[in-house]
Amino acid sequence: MKTVLAFLFLTFIAFTHAESYEDVKEEIKNEVEREIFEDLEEESDVLESNVRELNDAKPWRFRRAIRRVRWRKVAPYIPFVVRTVGKK
């Protein structure tokens, strides 16, 4: 909400002090670009912190390995493995 109010305030200032429509358009464009770059910087900081968390050593590695198994590809072989193990 603060960003919207700041944007509207800057737009109002631009309209009251601008010499022409082109000046207003250019000033608004610059403000929008600046806000977008600031948001992207914030998001990249969040993503970098998430990457650090993902690279940390985690417990339950075996559990995560089981989750990654493609069960649809493995499921047809389960009865064969059970029969083979049961024969011994």
UniProtKB/Swiss-Prot annotation:
Let me know which tissues express this protein, per UniProt: Expressed in entodermal epithelium along the body column.
| One cellular component (GO) term of this entry | extracellular region
Report the main location listed first in the record.
Answer: secreted
List modified residues, type Valine amide. 85
Answer whether the UniProt record assigns the keyword Signal to this protein.
yes
Compartments in which it is found: Secreted; Target cell membrane
Residue numbers covered by the propeptide annotation in the UniProt entry: 19-57
Membrane-spanning parts: none
Segment forming the signal sequence: 1-18
Recite the UniProt keywords alphabetically: Amidation, Antibiotic, Antimicrobial, Immunity, Innate immunity, Membrane, Secreted, Signal, Target cell membrane, Target membrane
Function in brief? Antimicrobial peptide with a broad-spectrum antimicrobial activity. Keeps its antibacterial activity under a wide range of salt concentrations that mimic physiological conditions of human blood, which is surprising, since Hydra is an obligate freshwater animal with nearly no salt tolerance. Does not affect red blood cells.
For this chain, the family text in UniProt reads: Belongs to the arminin family.
State the name under which the record lists this protein: Arminin 1b
| UniProt organism field | Hydra vulgaris
